[in-house]
């Protein structure tokens, strides 16, 4: 999975009113990976996707897909991309099957009923193929959007906020669908405001803010590099203050005054936990239980955006 399928080089976009939506972005996306783009509203993620998909023209820079330029080889690159928009853009009075098969014709592809049947079955839509869209739930309509985007057999799938407005159960269901699609060799790029979504399914994460890429990193590595763990030491009884002998650990007394929190770097050679527990014992405190909590991608994201805004 080392081959770069999408190569973005010094891409920028400035609108007529002077607004700079993208500031010389460079990014490579690997073939067969799930790449999550995170960013606050107005960060530039939608503009970036729109340029790659040929909807918006860049002001400068280049994008190639499998070696083809998105402007010089527009038809070639567009046929390799499937786009699932956030809005439910579907013909409500048409059947599921007709919605999906019609999309294939828009790319100049000949009818291929076996392929349409395959993706409808893959997305658990085959038994609903003759139903009209207006009869389906929101979650099923979103599946139809994915089926439409896959109808012309693209090798890249863009998902713009794929689980926006759906409940937790449907969201997790959608994650499973994305994982299954990846197994077929499709490269998946998703934008999301649900940071746990990126944490759960993405191989790599790119954080975009104010038109710039702040960081691109493997999800696990980002969590490892910037993640901290919190150790909560639960006590057998209340204490009014943390003993002075424990000052060096920068502990925080819990709200119930029956626990103390210790934050440490997971990358450090020595976390200091062993010494801390011994010093707690020496201070005469009685331990009841220990709990650890890993820093989340959400906390890291907020931290990165805050740092970028302060520059």
Predicted features along the sequence, with ranges:
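Catalytic Walker B motif of ABC-type/P-loop ATPase nucleotide-binding domains
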Residues: 157-160
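ABC transporter nucleotide-binding domain
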Residues: 175-264
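Short, charged/small-residue-rich alpha-helical element at the C-terminal edge
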Residues: 231-304, 311
């Amino acid at each position: 999975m080392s081959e770069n399928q999408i190569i973005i080089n010094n891409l920028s976009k400035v609108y007529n009113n002077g607004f700079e939506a993208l500031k010389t972005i460079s990014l490579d996306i690997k073939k067969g990976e799930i790449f999550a783009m995170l960013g606050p509203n107005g960060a530039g993620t939608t503009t970036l996707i729109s340029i790659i998909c040929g909807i918006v023209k860049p002001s400068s820079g280049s994008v190639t897909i499998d070696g083809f330029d998105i402007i010089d080889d527009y038809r070639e690159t567009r046929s390799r991309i499937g786009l699932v928009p956030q809005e439910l853009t579907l013909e409500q009075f048409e059947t599921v099957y007709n919605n999906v098969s019609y999309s294939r014709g828009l790319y100049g592809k000949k009818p291929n009923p076996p392929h349409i049947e395959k993706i409808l079955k893959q997305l658990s839509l085959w038994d609903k193929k003759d139903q009209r869209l207006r009869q389906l739930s929101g979650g099923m309509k979103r599946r139809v959007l994915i089926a439409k985007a896959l109808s012309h057999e693209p090798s890249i799938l863009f998902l713009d906020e794929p689980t926006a407005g759906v409940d937790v159960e449907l969201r997790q269901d959608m994650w499973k669908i994305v994982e299954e699609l990846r197994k077929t060799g499709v490269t998946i790029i998703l934008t999301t405001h649900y940071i746990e979504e990126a944490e759960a399914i993405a191989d790599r994460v790119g954080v975009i803010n104010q038109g710039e890429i702040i960081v691109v990193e493997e999800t696990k590595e980002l969590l490892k590099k910037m993640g901290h763990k919190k150790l909560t030491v639960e006590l057998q009884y209340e204490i009014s203050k943390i003993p002075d002998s424990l000052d060096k650990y920068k502990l925080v007394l819990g709200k119930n005054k029956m626990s103390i929190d210790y934050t440490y770097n997971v990358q450090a050679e020595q976390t200091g936990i062993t010494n801390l527990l011994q010093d707690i014992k020496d201070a005469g405190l009685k331990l009841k239980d220990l709990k650890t909590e890993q820093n989340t991608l959400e906390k890291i994201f907020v931290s990165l955006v805050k740092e970028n805004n302060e520059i």
